[in-house]
């Protein structure tokens, strides 16, 4: 392969095993806590959004689940871990705060989009008077949020831009 044909590494991506310039011991500590050492992010945060999706998926068959969905509250990454039983919650928050700002911004943009969608759907469901309307809102929101959860998971796991592009087009 010629020099012009070789792919260049993205300078905005943190090198494997390095979260904010951490060392091998820090990377091992992060891995043991289920935090990706390359990105400094943990998939546990996605459980917060998966819970909302699960409730939305139940609404068409069980309209009474709308009340459960309406009880879902947005939480930031730090708020989620602070409120969770995640063993390494302080480490998760610290790693997030030390993450590459470009990766964290990508991740935060996606989680912000999910939060906006779920909040808007929640507001619309509060106004809806018919179960059929709530079911339609739930189905639409699920279709919008699920790909974003997948995309966020790709960022957490250090997926490449090509992976992200593939997810967004399929």
List the predicted regions and their residue ranges.
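N-terminal acidic, proline/glycine-rich, low-complexity intrinsically disordered segments
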Residues: 1-16
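Signal-transmission coiled-coils
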Residues: 20-165
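Acidic/polar low-complexity scaffolding segments in large eukaryotic proteins
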Residues: 166-170
């Amino acid at each position: 392969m010629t020099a012009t044909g070789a792919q260049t590494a993205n300078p905005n991506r943190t090198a494997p095993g390095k979260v904010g310039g951490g060392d091998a011991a820090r990377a091992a500590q992060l891995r043991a806590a289920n935090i990706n050492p390359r990105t400094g992010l943990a998939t546990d945060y996605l459980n917060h959004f998966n819970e909302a999706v699960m409730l939305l998926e139940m609404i068409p068959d069980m309209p009474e689940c709308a009340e459960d969905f309406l009880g879902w509250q947005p939480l930031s990454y730090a708020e989620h871990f602070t409120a969770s039983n995640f063993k390494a919650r302080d480490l998760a928050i610290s790693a997030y705060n030390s993450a590459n700002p470009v990766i964290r911004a990508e991740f935060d943009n996606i989680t912000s989009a999910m939060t906006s969608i779920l909040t808007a759907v929640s507001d619309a469901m509060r106004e809806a008077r018919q179960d059929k309307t709530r079911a339609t809102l739930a189905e639409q929101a699920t279709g919008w949020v699920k790909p974003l959860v997948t995309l966020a998971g790709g960022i957490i796991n250090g997926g490449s831009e090509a992976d992200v592009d593939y997810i967004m087009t399929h």
